[in-house]
UniProtKB/Swiss-Prot annotation:
A matching Pfam family: ZapB
Its biological purpose: Non-essential, abundant cell division factor that is required for proper Z-ring formation. It is recruited early to the divisome by direct interaction with FtsZ, stimulating Z-ring assembly and thereby promoting cell division earlier in the cell cycle. Its recruitment to the Z-ring requires functional FtsA or ZipA.
Example of a GO biological process term: FtsZ-dependent cytokinesis
Subcellular location: Cytoplasm
Keywords from the UniProt entry: Cell cycle, Cell division, Coiled coil, Cytoplasm, Septation
Record-given protein name: Cell division protein ZapB
Amino acid sequence: MSLELLSKLETKIQAALETIELLKMELEEEKQKNHTLNEQNQQLSQDLTSWNEKVTGLVGLLNDEVSE
């Protein structure tokens, strides 16, 4: 191979490595976002369960009052 071809190959390999590094960084960012969203989803699910329990309790109290 000529030096020119080796130089071009080296440039392409370097560009590929830089692209891989950028993609790795983006992947880590997306993993962190996913983790944060999963935590928020879990909290919202707990909040929803809590509100459902409260509403069910209030509806039960209203039913008791209406029945009396």
